[in-house]
Each structure stands twice: as C-alpha cells, then as structure tokens.
Amino acid sequence: MTNQVPEPVTFGERALQIEDVLALANRQVPTVLQSDSAYRQRIAKGAQFLDSLLDKEGVIYGVTTGYGDSCVVAVPLQHVEALPRHLYTFHGCGLGKLLDAQATRAVLAARLQSLCHGVSGVRIELLERLQAFLDQDVLPLIPEEGSVGASGDLTPLSYVAATLSGEREVMFRGERRQSSDVHRELGWDPLVLRPKEALALMNGTAVMTGLACLAFARADYLLQLATRITAMNVVALQGNPEHFDERLFAAKPHPGQMQVAAWLRKDLAIDAPTAPLHRLQDRYSLRCAPHVLGVLADSLNWLRSFIEIELNSANDNPIIDAEAERVLHGGHFYGGHIAFAMDSLKNLVANVADLLDRQLALLVDERYNHGLPSNLSGAPADRAMINHGFKAVQIGTSAWTAEALKNTMPASVFSRSTECHNQDKVSMGTIAARDAIRVLELTEQVAAATLIAANQGVWLRSKAADARPLPPALAAMHEQLAADFPPVIEDRALEGELRLCLQRIADRHWRLHAQ
C-alpha cells in the first residue's frame, strides 16, 4: 500500500472552497502557482500598465498620492518607489496575541487567492513569493488586534508585506526568526515592493476571511458533534425519541431542522414509531434540540456563500483593469459580508453552548435525570457521600457558556469613524471573526465536558436492570470514548481528559453524520 500524494492547490486556476483553505491551514496539501503562460502574461500586464501610467505621470491612489485622507497629497515621482515601504512601516503597530500557525496559513492563502485575480497591479514575482511562503511554511508573526475591517486588514497585513520584504519576524521550522535570516537561509532575495504592491497586499480582507474559513469549519463539525451528544443524552436521560419523528418535522420543514432530526433518528436507530413512554414530553433542551441546532444547519449554506465569495474576490483598492486601461477606485476592502457572517455565526454557536449546558444540568441533577446518581458519580453507596462526580465540571460549563453568550454582541454595530474621517464607516469584520473564534473555543469546551458527562450517563444507564442495548452508532461512539475517558467512579481531576477531548474535537477525531 502506498501513500497517495494529495492533489496540490493551484492558485490562479480555480475558485477555492473553505475546505481548501482548511487543508492549506493544516499543511495537508501542497501549493503551486498557475504556470500557464497566458495567465502569467495577464498578471504581468497589470504591473506593466501601472508602470506606463507612471511614465505618463498619471494620478493613481496609493501610488502617486498619499494614503487614506492623504490621497490629496501628491507624491513626486522621485518618492514613488519609497512609498510602499512607508505604508507597511507605519502600519507596524499591531498588538494583542499573535495569530497561530493555522490562522496565519489561512491568511496567506486568502491574500494570495485574491491577488491571483490579476486586477491588483502586482508582479508575478510577488505571487510566487507568497506561494513560496506557504510552501516552505514561512509564517509572518501577525498580531491579531488593530484592524477595523476597512480599509481591509491594513495593520495585520502589514506584517505580511514587511516579512516578504525581509523585515520583522517569522515563525520557521518551529523557531521565531528574523525574516531576513530566513530569506538568507532559503537563498531568497527579499522583495523590494513596487508601487501599489504594499497597498495590494494590505488593503484587503484576508485576515477576517482566513479566520472566517476556520470558524466555519469548526462550526460545521460542532453541529454534528452536538447532535451526537444530544442523542447520547436522550439515552442517558431516557428521553422520548418520538420528538424526532419524521412526520412531525414534515409539518415544519426547515431543511436544517429536518436534517438534525434525521441524524438523531439514525443515531437512536428509530425507523418506526416507538411504544409510548411514561413521559410524554421531555424538557426543551432535548425536545427542541433539532430546532436549536437546525438554525445553525440552515445558516451554513448562506455563511459558506458569503465567505467563499469574499475569499475568491479581488478585495483591494484601486482595481487595475489593464485590458481596458482603467484604474477603478472603490471600496472592495470593506468587510461587511464577513462581519455579518461572523456576528451571526457566534450567535448560532453560542446557542449550541447554551443547549448543551442545559442538557448537562439535567444529567447531573437527580431531580431531573430519571434515576441516575447525583452528579453522575459512579461511586458505590458506601463512598457516595464523599464523591462529587461531575459537579465542578457542570459549574465550569456554566461559566464557559456565560462567557460565550456574553461575546455574542455584534461587532459590526460598533463602527467608529477613524483616519481623519476618511474611514468614517468601517466593518469591524476582523473583530467579529476573532469573537467568533473565541465563542467557538468556549463552546467546544462546553461540548467536551458534556460529551464526557453524556458518556458517563450512558454507562450508568447501561448498568440499570431495565437497560436496553445501545443503538449501533452510539455503541461505537461509547466504545471509542471509553478508551480515552474511563468511567468516573472515584473523584479525579478531569482537566487532562477535557483537554484531550478538546484535541479530539480539533482533530475531528470522530466520524459523525456528514463525513
């Protein structure tokens, strides 16, 4: 058996999907740049057209003028070559944590894909070097704070422009290095950015878009995992599976809601009406799970559309139409679609946290868990009084849920006039994307805790005299989980197991519904 080499992602050849960015961010696929001569000539034509305008002393924003409100300031031709370095230099003021390696790769992929449209006036050499950064895993150290999301992600992307020029720092082979040293080691000459090239690199939405791709992928897996956890909790709490009847959902046919109900039926092995239970209706966190999770499921389609259109767009300013010999000044750097998508996603995901938190609250409370021990403790009767099982885990889950819900405040409504009122309406899309990532982190923590607790609940229920065999999908999941998370009989610190579960979620370890 041979290891199959994955097909490379060829920039400049086709539109990218979120899955392409995820694969690039995880170093799962190689990259190449379109080698077709006609394509390369088209890229070159944009840079040549700009040079011809300079020869004619044409006025081009950010090339022969200052930036932002300084666009009324003419830059003499003898200073035009120096302007790109000034742009990335004065924007070197980012703060906050550095983007991690996965996020940085996603940013590089998003910026390269945008510039490969050939309407930004950059040389093929710039595209080649960006692709080489991805290929060799040379990762600019990018502070995550400092963007208002219009004009694009200027400050964070200045770190891309600077490192391509051999300045500032990169992460390379696990070490924090000077970009100039890494260039020397790889035998590269640092780029000297030509007129418009620093602006083309920086004046776009690559940071928010790269983060949005990662957030979408995490939310998609979380949706499936939350559905599986719900099915396990239906078993642990002796819930009523008729709440997920296919005929019931035909009466209110939201597609995502119907999909989640179908997944639950499959997990619970329901293919026919079941015998009536003593409890006609479960609490909402079980009964209405398809209605909560279905909103996220239905939203994934339009979220994908917003993100992928942005990903595959030319989103800087000005746009260089070399064919028509025109320079088009506009506002494609405005990240409004990503801002709205991420503000919406964090609301959708926080509702998943709230749902799972409520399910865990039922599991640990002997007044509502239908015969399970208090706090899901597996201790024998003579030691029950000193064992507390999942009590603290449930408290922690409440804290994580509260923080997730707090972070759902939309970022896009906090537009601030800035840059001498030139940027008087801005998207805050990068803040929205960062918020969405944080809400996902917190919700994954809730999911990890609830998953381990649900598995404990299923185990405890299986010990009852009237226990039924687990449906196949849940039996397989229970067996997989038991290998990592043995039953809690005597109290033990669960931090390590929670962290392991989070890593399993990050790795998409369990094959779930749509995979």
Predicted regions and their residues:
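C-terminal auxiliary extensions adjacent to catalytic cores
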Residues: T2-V29, L33-A38, R42, G46-L54, ...
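FAD-binding core of FAD-dependent oxidoreductases
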Residues: Y61-L83, F90-L115, P143-S165, S180, ...
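Glycine-rich loops and low-complexity Gly/Arg-rich segments
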Residues: R85-T89, L134, R168-E169, L225-T227
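Glycine-rich, flexible loop motifs
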Residues: T2-E57, L87-P143, V234
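Cysteine-centered functional microenvironments
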Residues: I142-S147, E323-V327
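Conserved, non-catalytic sequence blocks in retroelement Pol enzymes and Pol-derived host proteins
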Residues: V119, V148-A150, M385
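Generic alpha-helix structural propensity
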Residues: A38-Q41, K45, G62, Q78, ...
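A broadly conserved amphipathic alpha-helix scaffold signal in soluble, globular proteins
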Residues: E128-D135, T155-S158, A162, Q224
